[in-house]
């Protein structure tokens, strides 16, 4: 039988992403640990400080030993595709990163918009059957991000490593019919930058290292105010970058061209709307009574929204797309790469949240389907 006192223990907050997993404890202002969402399986026996023969490695440990490992990424485009590896990742986060016993603390977990029913139920089964958690809650990633901005109604533009989406939220609930997704995000920008660098003749081996190109992207790339001005603007940002091997590359047109694919995915051969039109379309697909409220509370979330200039470019294009005189406000907090996690920390700290949990007794009585009834 469930010990009710366990629901009073601070919850473990998971924000699982295609590129990074963030984990920490309810009530704290930021995640305790942020690790790469990767699991490495040894090609041969590898000694480890944790055990004489470790069967798998996760996060940075896996990436540092990539030569001797088969690397698996359990989350692709926001969705779990390798459940065995996902379970290993969660186990490592519980036991080694946080050092907690999963059967003693409730678990709050973010999930992508339009998460398939079978994925939600599989997550529920693993948490209750494998980890024996006392309670669980699955929360839409965008709802968590909006909560971090102290809002319950607004439009969230979320862009991480694997997917970009626009999610209208009304009084704390996402509106699925108006959600739009674009499968262009941080990973695609990194790959695009890699191709551009190779095409320019920078064929140093470390250019093929994703972590190196990610660093170039995060330190040097910006968004121009308008694509027609890109070439002119790029000349103002000529900068050098020293690679880990000591070689130097000079960034020019790469600097502004790469994030442009968020606004014009046609450049990657993807014939979908860019983020400005996605925002506008999502709002226009909502009831007319709330459209003005959504335009007035647009919240950016995810690491791929961190490019300098993105907020200004988005505002400029939305002013052109929206009806004349429509008030538009875009919130872009400095910690928005963690906003969904922070929202989870805030929500689970509220005394009223206790009634929201799917408890172990709920799972025992109704099965995994109970998550469809209590988490929506």
From Swiss-Prot:
Coiled-coil segments on the chain, per record: none
A Pfam family per the record: Actin
UniProt xrefs under Gene3D superfamilies: 3.30.420.40, Actin, Chain A, domain 4 (3.90.640.10)
Alphabetized GO MF terms: chromatin binding
A single Gene Ontology CC term: cytoskeleton
Biological processes annotated in GO: negative regulation of DNA-templated transcription; regulation of smoothened signaling pathway
SMART domains linked: ACTIN
UniProt entry keywords in alphabetical sequence: Cytoplasm, Cytoplasmic vesicle, Cytoskeleton, Nucleus, Transcription, Transcription regulation
Keyword Transcription regulation: yes
Cellular localisation: Cytoplasm, Cytoskeleton; Cytoplasm; Nucleus; Cytoplasmic vesicle, Secretory vesicle, Acrosome
UniProt superkingdom: Eukaryota
Family under the similarity heading: Belongs to the actin family.
Role summary: Negatively regulates the Hedgehog (SHH) signaling. Binds to the promoter of the SHH signaling mediator, GLI1, and inhibits its expression.
Protein name: Actin-related protein T1
Gene: Actrt1
